[in-house]
């Protein structure tokens, strides 16, 4: 599901919600809310802050050291620079919902 499909899913009045008090959003409201959350996560990770949302999961940044690798086509050695890798680890509720 891409971002546009997810926004449509968020605004779908026909799918069943667990809570009767769930207020549906317009597409514009859903897009604005999603963009705000995504921009905030990116900004926090960029500032080297970990984000833990109980039950949902955690966003973290892992530093990868520089290392030597190989070009898979030629087999030639090459240097891979150090970089920061953003990661997501699913929380218990997320894992349980998938199984």
Curated annotation (Swiss-Prot):
| Molecular functions per Gene Ontology | DNA binding; structural constituent of chromatin
Gene3D superfamilies annotated for this entry? IHF-like DNA-binding proteins
Q: Keywords on this record?
A: DNA condensation, DNA-binding
* Organism superkingdom: Bacteria
Q: Indicate the secretion signal residues.
A: none
Its gene name is hup
Chain positions covered by the region annotation Disordered: 67-86
Q: Which GO terms describe its biological process?
A: chromosome condensation
Task: Briefly state the protein's biological role.
Answer: Histone-like DNA-binding protein which is capable of wrapping DNA to stabilize it, and thus to prevent its denaturation under extreme environmental conditions.
Biological classification of the source = Bacteria, Pseudomonadati, Pseudomonadota, Alphaproteobacteria, Rickettsiales
Asked whether the UniProt record includes DNA-binding among its keywords, one would answer: yes
Q: How does it assemble?
A: Homodimer.
Q: Which SUPFAM superfamilies match?
A: IHF-like DNA-binding proteins (SSF47729)
Tell me what this protein is called. DNA-binding protein HU
What organism does the UniProt record list as the source? Rickettsia conorii (strain ATCC VR-613 / Malish 7)
Q: Which family does it belong to?
A: Belongs to the bacterial histone-like protein family.
Would the keyword DNA-binding be found if you checked this record's keyword annotation? yes
């Amino acid at each position: 599901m891409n971002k546009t499909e997810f926004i449509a899913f968020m605004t779908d009045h026909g799918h069943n919600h667990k809570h009767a008090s769930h207020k549906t959003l317009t597409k514009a409201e859903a897009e604005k809310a999603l963009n705000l959350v995504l921009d905030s996560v990116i900004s926090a990770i960029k500032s080297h802050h970990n984000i833990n949302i109980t039950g949902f999961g955690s966003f973290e940044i892992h530093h990868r050291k520089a290392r030597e690798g190989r070009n898979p086509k030629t087999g030639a050695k090459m240097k891979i620079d150090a970089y920061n890798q953003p990661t997501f680890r699913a929380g218990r509720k997320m894992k349980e919902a998938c199984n």
